[in-house]
Amino acid sequence: MSRFVDKLPLFDRRPSPMEEAEGLPRSGYLGQLHHHQYYQPHSNMLPLEQSPPTSTKHTSVTLAQLLKRVNDARSGSSTPISSPRYTIELGGSKPESVSSESDDHHSDDGGSEGQPRALVLKFTDLTYSVKQRRKGSCLPFRRAAADEPELPAMRTLLDGISGEARDGEIMAVLGASGSGKSTLIDALANRIAKESLHGSVTINGESIDSNLLKVISAYVRQEDLLYPMLTVEETLMFAAEFRLPRSLPTREKKKRVKELIDQLGLKRAANTIIGDEGHRGVSGGERRRVSIGVDIIHNPIMLFLDEPTSGLDSTSAFMVVTVLKAIAQSGSVVVMSIHQPSYRILGLLDRLLFLSRGKTVYYGPPSELPPFFLDFGKPIPDNENPTEFALDLIKEMETETEGTKRLAEHNAAWQLKHHGEGRGYGGKPGMSLKEAISASISRGKLVSGATDGTVSVAASDHSAPPPSSSSVSKFVNPFWIEMGVLTRRAFINTKRTPEVFIIRLAAVLVTGFILATIFWRLDESPKGVQERLGFFAIAMSTMYYTCSDALPVFLSERYIFLRETAYNAYRRSSYVLSHTIVGFPSLVVLSFAFALTTFFSVGLAGGVNGFFYFVAIVLASFWAGSGFATFLSGVVTHVMLGFPVVLSTLAYFLLFSGFFINRDRIPRYWLWFHYISLVKYPYEAVMQNEFGDPTRCFVRGVQMFDNTPLAALPAAVKVRVLQSMSASLGVNIGTGTCITTGPDFLKQQAITDFGKWECLWITVAWGFLFRILFYISLLLGSRNKRR
């Protein structure tokens, strides 16, 4: 099998265009993990260049310490730095002599075969099946056609998968699409419900509590779920606020962020926003590394990644895996799925697990791929990437009836022949889980969530009790700190997208201007009364329709929210309240803008008190409308589903508000909808604010004939009709006599069951209710585990 060597010097070399574009360090810990590896057919070691150790003493070091030593060497000495050999272990054996601090680390953790390991993640006979429905059928009772094959009721995604991953190594899960790669990563990361997953997953031979696993591990999704308007440094700093212990000073958190930025090669992009389709930001490779950084901010002991190189070019993909290799060598267990690794990436992987239709078809180091397939009768050509050959062969075998089964049986026989029944590769755990976690903390691992406050950046107190499920709090921060951090982050996002608020304000002002010019200075005639009814109905429904733009807000953040709450970054209640706090000031501005545009122009009554009540009911309408849209955003999963639901529901609310049909004319079987109509209460509130004064008269004398057939009669005839009515009724009715006052008109409209202040508070209560329902929807609908 052919290999190649990158001959570029490690120091004082010119940066490549990709490095200049993505800000990768030219020297330091990551700069020394070079682009090409020399992969020898009869050796399990990868020689790499590295800066010299400052001491020959065997000590475990963290990434931060290595970075500090390199920086100190560069800044504090003018002597040229030599480049001794640095070795990354690929197989189970170790060379006789190595001179690097990584060797010290491996030596401490049991890197050589037979020596104890600090952490061993072992999974045994993992099996997971899901119910399967016939394609194209929405009805479960649909009968199959005669020529249609009967599908099995259950589909097995994982079928007896076993293996182990160790600290200091990267285990890569490979396979074609649908082979079960992501499912296995989810199973190991405890993202599948226990009642659905069969088999066992242990760390150092012990089952682990779910809360403790969330504290010591991280899960990186395939998608880059980041706020586009935050800079790289801000994104990582907010992650530090959520994941690092509250006892850790802010300066230490900032220090950790700076170190992580250097570690990820993001120094040049630190002050660049993430960006999206409408805003230029970091490159795809940098965005991927930021996504990884968000989840490793607390320096997790276990790291699970679902295809971290997906969608990246070869150079960016290699740098991402290089970062993961550095994380593994700092003492973490790294498990990731990957579609098709290149030669260079293969040189960084320690253990491979190939899946085909949920079965294990190869498990072992990359160096054993050639003899494995040679023994199977399919030798790997010398000039071909072993993983590409393996994936192509596996895909070909899947087309055969018993192809996958044959390959899986060959793997089982190979494992039994070369590694025995235990399927182990090298060392076993030399300490208990608690001891291993304590040892990891003492090496500088940042384990978030310890209630005793003993965890810090450079925790070195070996006497401190190890964290356990009982000593680990569910959340790092108390409620009020979560509120502050979430509110601050949301305000930054809002401030950097002013166009969103400007468009909303423009919509309100344009609507108010149109209404003001149409209903300009309404009089107190019967026609003016009818025109007021139309103005109030349109105005109050407009408040709700303009709130529909709140629907995409949470939908755009949904997956970020799911990622952050999967590891208890914050409480759902904190998110709901901070979301409310950030959105409320804009509602106040919109309310005053609409009221100032319409109240005096239309000629509404009430003076100053009436104006401020009008502002209050408009604000309450915005509050209830935004709450309704927010609640729906927690229920629906896509904006294309949400908008039809919002618009149609608001149309029903307007229909049953009492404007088109009075309450006493609504059929009894629809009366319940009248009382849950969001438009009913603000509509009745402004009606009472306008017509509640008994001293105001809206129909006088002959005006009673308006909107009747008698309206066409001459004025003199109308007066004689009034005189005849007066004589008949015994009541003096003249042309100036008040026939209908404001309260009389409210009775005609059946607006009698609630006062105007009651309508105001009911509208406010709707807003609170919908936000409570939004919180409940987050509790019920944000499960991060498969069923």
From Swiss-Prot:
Residue span, ABC transporter domain: 121-382
Residue stretches making up the ABC transmembrane type-2 domain: 484-691
Disulfide bonds: none
GO molecular function: ABC-type transporter activity; ATP binding; ATP hydrolysis activity; ATPase-coupled transmembrane transporter activity
Top-level taxon: Eukaryota
Family named by the database record: Belongs to the ABC transporter superfamily. ABCG family. Eye pigment precursor importer (TC 3.A.1.204) subfamily.
Protein name: ABC transporter G family member 5
Gene behind this protein: RCN1
